Amino acid sequence: MKKVFYILLFAGMILSGQVMAQNKLNFGLSQPQDKATLPVSSSKPAVALRKVKTANPSTLEKVSDNEFLLSTGWELTDANRLTASGESVFNPKLNTADWYNATVPGTVLTTLVEQGVYPDPYFGLNNLYIPDSLCRKDWWYRLPIKLPENSSGKSVWLLFNGINYKADVWLNGKLLGHIAGAFQRGEFDATPFLKSGGENILAVHIFPPRNPGIPQEESSKTNAGPNGGQLCLDGPTFISSEGWDWVPGIRDRNIGIWQDVRLKLTDGVSIIDPQVIADLPLPDTTSVSLTIKSIIQNTSARSNQITVTGRIDQIEFSKMFYLKPYESRTITLTSQEYPQLKIKNPRLWWPNGYGRPELYKLNLEVKCNGNGISDQKIIRFGVREFSYEMAVAQPDKKMWRIEFNPIQSAGKVLFNNIDRVDMGNGTFVPQLVSSADPSLLTSIDKDSKNPFLTIKVNGIPIFCKGGNWGMDDGMKRVSREKMEPYFKLHKLANFNMVRNWTGESTEELFYDLCDEYGLLVWNDFWLSTEGYNLNVNDNQLFVANATDVVKRFRNHASIAIWCPRNEGYAPLLIEPQLTALIANEDGTRHYQPNSRNLNLRPSGPWHYLSDGADYYRSIAEGFSTELGTPSIPTAATIRSFMPLEDQWPISDTWFYHDLHDGQKDYLRAIETKYGISETLDDFCKKAQLVNYDSHRAMFESWNSKLWNKTSGILLWMSHPAWPSMVWQTYSWDYETFGSFYGAKKACEPVHIQMNLNDKKIIIINTTLKSYKLLTAKLELFDLSGKKLSAKSISTAVPANKLTETFVAELPESAPQVYLLRLTLTDKNKVVSQNEYWRTNEKEGLFDELNQLEAPYLTAKIGKQQNPGKTIIVLSNQGKVPAIGLKLNLRDPQTGKIVLPANFSDGYFTLLPDEKKQVEVEWNSAKISNPEIIVEAYNLKRQGIAMVK
């Protein structure tokens, strides 16, 4: 069998166009690693205590009159145990005392951890104590359900919004159907199999992927190991759950009912996958024409008169027609037929920093033969229109820069991504397909030197800034309560784009929150690095999942790009299907066939650069979907996920939490710049200054070339999937640190900066507002806070442009360590302030900071704006600067840091006799009166003295 498998696999790679030496492909580990290389803790293993199973009756949580969530009363067991019992899962009187109370939505591992079978895998080395066999067995979910009172005479449907990896769905011993792939819905007509009285037994048989792979466990004796392995063969699934260099192997590979389950009632007719298309007469945005499309399906054996009714705010419309028995029809409602669908002065959806992300709701209802509502859909959408500037190759191979608006191309495929043309330096451009109509494109430059993608929203070019999400949560625990603070942090960091890397965060809530917070989405599908990671075994399954994802999520305003894979092109058998899918089933967005290279710059680097000016000199250009540097969190965060014995010095537990070989330069820089660390707190405070400078440098290098063949930069990564020591701007527990504030500073909508390569002082304005006169000021201060020099200039600052001011003249007589502060003001109101601690030493030594005395800080609480939001006025009444100031809130009862708590600034300098206002926001429902604590490079964490 093994021989046959590899023959078929190789044949598949030939057909897919991925013909290369077998030894270049990553199959992961073929056997578990040597036990001598496993990470070791100095702490005793955690002991889990299983909870007693409780009676948890199922309930129907009402969503609407005809729709209910099935989230309580679920039970779980592994199939081997059920088989050994000799009992039938369909028996209403089955004794389930030895089953688990299941969490739905949730993975198998989520249930087992919540039920105390295994310890929290995110703490220390606990993940090692959870058997990897969880992903190598079948599981059964079971739910007794009673029908709602209003179900009589109606069709009853069961809707599964996401299972992993495959499932058979049974009701009262009858097979309803199958679901395959982690991202495909399953909807089943349960009506013929239901009992009108008493309980119905819903049972779901979960099958794991066939190729779960073997994770490498990272330690000080190993490197990060392979990124993934055999699990890639089974895509679409969560391929990183086999283990990547930012997350360990998740023991169940996230199998289970990971999204919600619903019961729906209809009365003979259903609405299927409606779509709202907003067409603006760009550049005019004072009106919009809406088109509404939907499949209407007659699910009955009789002909029916159908009435579809829609409502958007105060606008109403309806359409009546007839459907034959079991007939499905796509209806299209346009503003030509329904003039009310042309809306004047619409509220536009904008990315963060460009305007408000306004959203509308369409309430679509369908009735059958004049009876009550049979089905209803509420679709939230934004009035916005995407267009894309990019280059294509002409027959003479010269670059033609064009603007492409998918709505205008009316579902036609225009680009030939397979016969692409190499433009040098790792960047390619597509050709036009032979049948392409050039009149569907807007010509910008027939002899362009700019191959790179620019995304435009409502006719305005957007300077894309943000980061990658490898996975929202390593165990797919994705409630709104848990996830929303992360999106809020992205907004507060002034980001406007996130990348759904290899599609592993594909769920409704992810897109809902991106819509609400104005975050554009670069959306990958479920393939990774071409030529290294394996292609999928089942192309048909892959395309089926992709089709369902596009139909399901295409109304989300935030999705800007569909992309087939991380770092590469789709296999040749899949590529034309995906191209046609996006054109036909979406028709409003660009299909970007590669996450690097095609109309993009190559991705990386991902390691620390000792000289931030190198980003300016050789890296900043074009649009990059991955640029990263390590990012160790605060000491408080490390203490929260690691036993005391492993916290300091650096231990195997650090390595298991993603501190790997690629961070040697980063660790060396912390020591070289700031000195050898004696404690965890000492090390982490130094790391935060490195984090701040490195993350700011990446974004500011892109700023320095705004619209000069430069249009977007996404961090690898902005969001952690678990408690990590590597790529992130905040920690998994919402703690913000140097990386967050450095990125936030550089991504300010109006920002003043000094280019590290040429010392130019420039102003970046990525807003739609022009300023007639702003004043840019440069000041130098020594370590006592004494001002050494100053220079200022006033200038106009146009909207969405870079403005140069002057070159910073840094005196040779400056002390070894000094502060360079830039301030941008509008009539004495600070618009932007940016600080660089500088050194005259070539190696950038800041050891003089270690000799500073502690400042004396006081605080005054300003007027509380509302519960959970207030202003803190900090004052430095000491004789030395407070460097790298970091604020937190603390629970006075427990002494623990309050998270999330969002501060408007962090890791800033407060000179002697200076004051600074900092705004803080937290969840006042959890704690109403927290303490304020402060720490700095030269100040240990302490409560702060309050003054009147």
Describe each PLM feature range.
Residues 96, 254-255, 635, 663-667, ...:
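Alpha-helix initiation and N-capping motif
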Residues 1-7, 20-465, 470-473, 477-497, ...:
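Secreted/periplasmic carbohydrate-active enzymes, especially glycoside hydrolases
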Residues 15-16, 512, 537, 639, ...:
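Residues in and immediately flanking transmembrane alpha helices
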Residues 674-685:
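Short glycine/proline- and acidic residue-enriched helix-loop micro-motifs
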Residues 433-434, 440-445, 497-661, 669, ...:
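Substrate-binding/catalytic cleft of secreted carbohydrate-active enzymes
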Residues 351-354, 685, 689:
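Short, conserved micro-motifs enriched in small and acidic residues
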Residues 7-16:
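Bacterial N-terminal signal peptides
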Residues 232, 665-674:
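Active-site-adjacent bridging/hinge elements
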